[in-house]
Amino acid sequence: MKDRSLRCLSLFLLIGVFAPARGQSGGELHFCLHGEPKTFNPVLVDDEASENVRYLTGGVLIRLNRQSQALEPALATSWEISRDRRTITFHLRKDLHFSDGTPFSAEDVAYTMKLLMDPQTHSPTGDAFRSGEGSLEVRTPAADLAVITFPAPIAGLDRLFDQVSILSAHSPKKEMAVLGPFFVSDYKPGSYVLLARNPNYWKRDARGHALPYLDSVRLDIQRNRDIELLRFCRGELQLINRLDAEQFERLRHDNPAATRNAGTGLDAEEFWFNESPTAPLSEHKKAWFHMTEFRQAVSMAINRADLCRIVYGGYAKPAYGPVSPSNHFWFNSSLEDPKYDPKGALAMLKRAGFRYENEVLKDSSGNRVEFNLITNSGNAAREKMSVMIQQDLLQVGIKVNVVTLDFPSLIERMTRTLEYDACLLGLVNTDLDPDSQMTVWLSSGENHQWNPNQKAPATSWEAEIDKLMKEQASARTDQERKVKFDRVQQIVAEQQPFIYLINKDVLLAVSPALVGTAPVVLNPQAFWNAETLQLAAGTELGAHK
């Protein structure tokens, strides 16, 4: 480890870590995806790897500036929202083309929105726009004018379009024709995604130079975070979008100038029980997982402060619920701190009919309370958290078997076979606004993980959340919306469908060979301004072989 640290340090010294670098155009940026992209179709994206590709390739009508958190014109030069907040009118840039040369027009906006809102598409992005019964109407009075009318008012309507990558209605390349700074030029499953500079990208810098500066971006698929850090130290990668605390401390010790802490993030680590009625689980397990008192007791038995201190080295805060305290406006500050109370947890379980005998918890039928907790292999922090949760729950007589799976296998169990008891993963928040979480909170949503794709709400509290989420989306003022979303957060705190654990600090690694980075808490934290990133003058511009 010492030799590795010295090699890492000497590399940064050699490339001038202590001197401000000047950028040059061209070259290939290298960093990693931590899983296989599930899709390159932007309307179907619901995983982090696919989202990263979408962000780098997709052209949107409106872009949320991740640094200022203000909306900026993109493919639309301007827009107006009607007083009833049902209609948004976009004035589009003229003479733009997709990456394959296909002209861009209002027809493409209409095509994208209709596909997004088609129930047969099952678009997670489309869920954010579902505010009421009825169909979408899109008019295109001119090639540079698109008028979109929704069946019910939507608050924060313009912010939602940051997630809508416009597809071509006519390109033979379908979703592979894009309007963003890069396009997918090569993909080798299990190895890499190669993005090439889009020669038709519309944006220019202040001096009138065409963007992006980079020729290409190579996204290596690397689930092992230690290997990723080693490659960064070797100079094979120029950034790591998220470091765990141990890696951050290791790198900070060797070369603090290569580390960045953007502050407490918006994302949460959480786990949930499988409550799907079609899951191939025993009936007694289904009964436990459906029981509110069981979920509450499990939450109370977990020592979140220890998770923050031991797993994250203090670079994390205990999580209150679905909204990070860093999201100042939407966070419900009336929520109580997560309590660590194993004695209270055991008392609650006993009141719910469980028995504690010889340090073993049993249900009323004599079944030992035992379940499997799955998480993704190669993520050291989640593996450590799983073991600590295992130890905490053993104190109340619950036996937890930790099962680590490669990410494709984990996703297969979560979304297709439903062969799991409980799962520990992270929730990535792409925006500050609660409308971006529609696919999580609507009972019909694909990311309503504990019981997804419900035809009707399975519980009265889920029905209330459905109602509140739709009402807040059409409320007249942000204050009205906040009252309703505060109530959603309160219900979630009471029912514990997700057991929120911690909010991590946003920890990153940025090579001095990369110029123009400005890390933020909003995803994607390190490369939100990818079109203006440059390699430092003197850096080898050739592609990595």
Regions found by a protein language model. Give the residues of each.
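Extracytoplasmic/periplasmic ligand-capture domains
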Residues: Q67, R93-P124, V138-R139, P172-K173, ...
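Bacterial N-terminal signal peptides
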Residues: C8-V17
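N-terminal lobe/hinge region of extracytoplasmic solute-binding protein
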Residues: C32-R83, K114, A177
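A structural "hinge/loop" feature
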Residues: G35-N52, L75-T77, T102, P124-D127, ...
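Bacterial N-terminal signal peptides that target proteins for export
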Residues: M1-L9
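Surface-exposed binding/hinge segments that line
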Residues: Q24, H91, T125-S171, D186-K188
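Extracytoplasmic
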Residues: G26-E28, H34-G35, L56, A74-A76, ...
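Sec/Tat signal peptide C-region and signal peptidase I cleavage site
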Residues: A19-G23
